[in-house]
Amino acid sequence: MVVDKNASGLRMKVDGKWLYLSEELVKKHPGGAVIEQYRNSDATHIFHAFHEGSSQAYKQLDLLKKHGEHDEFLEKQLEKRLDKVDINVSAYDVSVAQEKKMVESFEKLRQKLHDDGLMKANETYFLFKAISTLSIMAFAFYLQYLGWYITSACLLALAWQQFGWLTHEFCHQQPTKNRPLNDTISLFFGNFLQGFSRDWWKDKHNTHHAATNVIDHDGDIDLAPLFAFIPGDLCKYKASFEKAILKIVPYQHLYFTAMLPMLRFSWTGQSVQWVFKENQMEYKVYQRNAFWEQATIVGHWAWVFYQLFLLPTWPLRVAYFIISQMGGGLLIAHVVTFNHNSVDKYPANSRILNNFAALQILTTRNMTPSPFIDWLWGGLNYQIEHHLFPTMPRCNLNACMKYVKEWCKENNLPYLVDDYFDGYAMNLQQLKNMAEHIQAKAA
């Protein structure tokens, strides 16, 4: 097959072959828009990382490979990409020869983890996690019935955090190899119990995994107008209210911590907006899911407001709502802002996108593990391991750590791990770097 390089669609490299995906096929992608992140790039390891256990995905890949070809022009374009260093922006300086060795070595590591059983689903573990998390929520409701209202609100905040981790794992297809079952359970835990849209989360989070800390790709580092991580963010302040906010951004490292409890308000708000636009989205998967996405989000807010209605006074209702919502926000935010915000970013056209393992390792910081942190953080203290192998069950991440540390040592890559306060200080330092840059420009 001769591919028209001017045709609409998408080109990406998988397992050494350049594949062409028509526009129609792209729009049918079950994962939605995340596929666009690897346009004209090597998607080999991101494909294997995301599609572990999916016979449908590998069947489609085999069909595309039959028409795959070597593309000298795109190969040269991959090798020509150069990074510019800036404030909080690093350069990917691994040579093409080193990169090829690294990619081959990582494939061997992935296969070894398979052989050692670390990628195997553990249904019993996740059944226990589901029951224990449901029990936390049930106990919160029971305490409300007994009149322990503030304690109940705090416990509900904890339940929402833990459901966040559990939903995250079902969305990554960790608990079982039955993808429709995982997706259905994540709809119940995520949308109905937690209030976060599953499809909104997948779109946002899978893109973050595919291009971690890559500018103009990873939405998790685009926090303008409240925060600016890189000089390029300053171009985004165009509207009048954004220009007004820019006046306080030089103090962003001072108010960042106070904003953490607001995360749940932000995510539930974005979820509501997403589900009621889902019918009109261009990707077929979102159109198909729209009704159940909407019904479960409406169901979530129905039980939340009914629960508040059962409280005896309006001051208690307001207090319960604020404590549970902001407590849940803080418990999630102190985790999700630790692992990547404290590490440098990479330019939009960086060649690092062709080296999946290096991308994840150079843009991720682990939190020092302990049994309590493993539970409270939902295994996301092993963020490096999780980003390298997103379908690996949480209960195997600790065992995976020694393999990854050894691989990093062999390939001269840093393995970043710090306690919470050191890592959080580095997060604030990134914000302060930009704050000082803005102050210097204004002087």
From Swiss-Prot:
Its EC number is 1.14.19.3. InterPro entries: Cyt_B5-like_heme/steroid_sf (IPR036400), FA_desaturase_dom (IPR005804), Fatty_acid_desaturase (IPR012171). The chain crosses the membrane at residues 136-156, 296-316, 318-338. It comes from the Eukaryota. Its main location: membrane. The keyword Cell membrane does not apply. One of its GO terms (cellular component) is presynapse. Pfam families: FA_desaturase. It is an enzyme of class 1 (oxidoreductase). GO terms for biological process: acetylcholine secretion, neurotransmission; collagen and cuticulin-based cuticle development; defecation; egg-laying behavior; endocytic recycling; lipid metabolic process; locomotion; multicellular organism growth. Keywords: Fatty acid biosynthesis, Fatty acid metabolism, Lipid biosynthesis, Lipid metabolism, Membrane, Oxidoreductase, Transmembrane, Transmembrane helix. It catalyses: (9Z,12Z)-octadecadienoyl-CoA + 2 Fe(II)-[cytochrome b5] + O2 + 2 H(+) = (6Z,9Z,12Z)-octadecatrienoyl-CoA + 2 Fe(III)-[cytochrome b5] + 2 H2O; (9Z,12Z,15Z)-octadecatrienoyl-CoA + 2 Fe(II)-[cytochrome b5] + O2 + 2 H(+) = (6Z,9Z,12Z,15Z)-octadecatetraenoyl-CoA + 2 Fe(III)-[cytochrome b5] + 2 H2O. HPO-19 and T05H4.4 are cytochrome b5 reductases required for PUFA desaturation in Caenorhabditis elegans. HPO-19 and T05H4.4 knockdown or mutation alter FAT-3 desaturase activity. This is Delta(6)-fatty-acid desaturase fat-3. The gene is fat-3.
